[in-house]
């Protein structure tokens, strides 16, 4: 779908500004609107979302990011700058307000981290290295009786952001959170004042992981995260000073979209790719990207090992009609944070679809690798024959797989649980709603497999969109049950020993849950695609409390902020507080740029 120039001009922040602006519209319309604004390309942000981006973000994408090889290589540098400024409505180099030292709420003191070392925490993606997303009552600092008294404590605006999709962490009484602008912030949990900021230079989507390091001159603790360019950073948790940066995967197609997991002095880093979004273009040499996991020394950033999901490097296959070389096998992006099993000395992670046909056996699978060497211990394929590229819908190019799969992936982290009888399980949740229990002590042998909700009459899956009734970014687990939200709407619970459904509650008709679930005794927390944060009873899913985040907020740092969809991340709970980001300007979500903190009042 091509937007008429007049309509495009009316929507842009710089509409009618100058002849140069009109030229910018022309380049955008000619080169970009084939995907942006076309319903067939649901993963391409529509123009109204792009208009909220900073010029630096657009220019970065055209020069070094996802769009560099899709369309950026067809533009001159002047055209890239023109498009960046026209679509954003801002001039390049004018976005300085994101630095902490430009904010009015700088903390007046920065006490040693050890003073708050005993405060309860939420660290990393899943609160623990088993990724259960479950807090004890003591660590949560809340009970079910406290939930109706939750009130907004503070709101922090992420400057120039359109997505607050990086899940915060709360450690040492501080909230660490990343932004799609590339900034990392350390906030005081009690007041929201900002201790420091760090600019990675590229979008950060990962949760923050905090761990001890042995680095002279540091505080002894680092904040670890990855960025869109597949860089991994360690910054001092006390000062925000960069301790080291590493690039564990040399392939330029790689990126990091999930949090690294810290265990025993090592970081286990998941590696995904942007190639799935670009490779249907006929001029693209499809496909070479390989998902995987890398292990780094947490104190130095040195790579200890790298294991790819595809065991062999891609080989030349054939050339398309344009003479462009095609490659394979490829794919298997890792979109989730690895899970640690100290008993088996193993790391577990889920893999994405293949980007070439036929699909490799380790695509859409759970893999177990040895934590010391990266050697593959076992794998279990959840969905077979899932070869997928964005843009391979009704109209397909020669680059598209011979048989296009449903794009199911394993987006959520596999979760390691110990049942009441002492047995252990790796639980896997999937986009189409399948839930599997594997035995980690029997090389991933299947124990049970169920569907969380069953089919929905009249609601059909679409490529690249979570299947109705499915589970996207993960569930929460105690010793007895798994608690989850469904992408079609409704929340439920399954018995971990048998897979039997314990309850399924619609909660709110028509609301989709595309975020991760969080729980503590008596309470399950979930954000919705329309921006509502909900708390339901763990026993039956009945609604206890809700808060509408899709509105403007007065922020402690004076940044204009609004909420949007709550997706990809989940709420965190620790030390009497619930914290969540609101805004998800992709996949049809509502943009937003606010981090919200709640407490009992």
Predicted regions: what is each one?
Residues 1-22, 89-114:
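N-terminal export/targeting leaders of redox proteins
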Residues 22-26, 30, 56, 60, ...:
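Solvent-exposed, polar/charged alpha-helical surfaces in well-ordered, non-transmembrane soluble domains
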Residues 31-32, 36-39, 62-66, 71, ...:
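Sec/Tat-exported extracytoplasmic proteins
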């Amino acid at each position: 779908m091509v937007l008429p120039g007049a309509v495009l001009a009316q929507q842009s922040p710089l509409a009618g500004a100058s002849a140069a602006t009109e030229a910018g519209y022309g380049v955008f319309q000619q080169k970009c609107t084939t995907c942006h604004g076309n319903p067939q390309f649901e993963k391409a942000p529509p123009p109204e979302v792009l208009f909220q981006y900073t010029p630096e973000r657009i220019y970065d994408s055209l020069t070094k990011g996802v769009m560099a090889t899709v369309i950026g290589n067809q533009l001159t540098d002047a055209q890239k700058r023109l498009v960046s400024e026209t679509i954003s409505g801002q001039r390049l180099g004018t976005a300085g307000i994101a630095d902490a030292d430009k904010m009015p709420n700088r903390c007046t003191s920065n006490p040693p981290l050890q003073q708050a070392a005993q405060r309860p925490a939420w660290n990393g993606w899943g609160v623990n290295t088993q990724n259960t997303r479950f807090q004890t009552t003591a660590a949560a600092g809340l009970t079910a009786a406290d939930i109706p008294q939750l009130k907004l404590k503070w709101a922090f605006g992420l400057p120039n952001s359109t997505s607050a999709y990086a899940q915060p962490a709360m450690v040492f009484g501080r909230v660490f959170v990343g932004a799609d602008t590339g900034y990392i912030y350390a906030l005081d949990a009690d007041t929201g004042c900002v201790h420091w900021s760090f600019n990675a230079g590229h979008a950060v989507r990962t949760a923050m992981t905090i761990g001890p390091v042995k680095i002279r001159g540091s505080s002894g603790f680092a904040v670890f995260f990855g960025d869109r360019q597949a860089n991994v950073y360690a910054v001092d948790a006390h000062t925000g000073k960069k301790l080291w940066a590493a690039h564990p995967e040399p392939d330029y197609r790689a990126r990091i979209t999930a949090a690294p997991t810290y265990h025993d002095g090592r970081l286990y880093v998941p590696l995904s790719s942007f190639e799935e979004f670009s490779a249907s273009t006929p001029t693209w040499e499809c496909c070479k990207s390989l998902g995987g996991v890398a292990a780094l020394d947490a104190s130095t950033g040195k790579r200890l090992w790298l294991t790819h999901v595809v065991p062999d490097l891609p080989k030349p296959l054939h050339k398309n009609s344009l003479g462009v070389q095609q490659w394979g096998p490829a794919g298997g992006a890792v979109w989730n944070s690895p899970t640690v099993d100290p008993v088996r000395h193993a790391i577990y992670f889920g893999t994405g679809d293949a980007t070439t046909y036929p699909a490799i056996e380790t695509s859409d699978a759970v893999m177990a690798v040895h934590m010391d060497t990266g050697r593959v211990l076992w794998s279990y394929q959840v969905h077979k024959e899932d070869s997928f590229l964005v843009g391979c819908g009704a109209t397909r190019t020669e680059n598209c797989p011979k048989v296009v799969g449903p794009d199911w992936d394993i987006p959520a982290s596999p979760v390691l649980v110990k049942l009441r009888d002492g047995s252990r399980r790796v639980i896997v949740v999937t986009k189409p709603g399948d839930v599997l229990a594997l035995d980690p002590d029997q090389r991933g042998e299947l124990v049970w497999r169920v569907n969380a909700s069953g089919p929905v009459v009249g609601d059909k899956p679409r490529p690249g969109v979570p299947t109705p009734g499915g589970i996207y970014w993960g569930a929460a687990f105690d010793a007895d049950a798994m608690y989850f939200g469904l992408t079609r709407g409704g929340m439920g619970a399954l018995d971990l020993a048998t897979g039997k459904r314990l309850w399924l509650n619609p909660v709110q008709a028509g609301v989709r849950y595309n975020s991760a679930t969080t729980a503590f005794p008596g309470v399950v927390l979930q954000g919705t695609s329309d921006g509502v944060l909900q708390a339901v009873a763990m026993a039956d899913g009945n609604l206890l409390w809700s808060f509408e985040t899709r509105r403007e907020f007065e922020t402690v740092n004076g940044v204009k902020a609004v909420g949007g969809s709550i997706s990809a991340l989940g709420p965190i709970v620790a030390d009497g507080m619930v914290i969540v980001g609101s805004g998800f300007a992709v996949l049809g979500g509502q943009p937003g740029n606010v981090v919200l903190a709640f407490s009992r009042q």
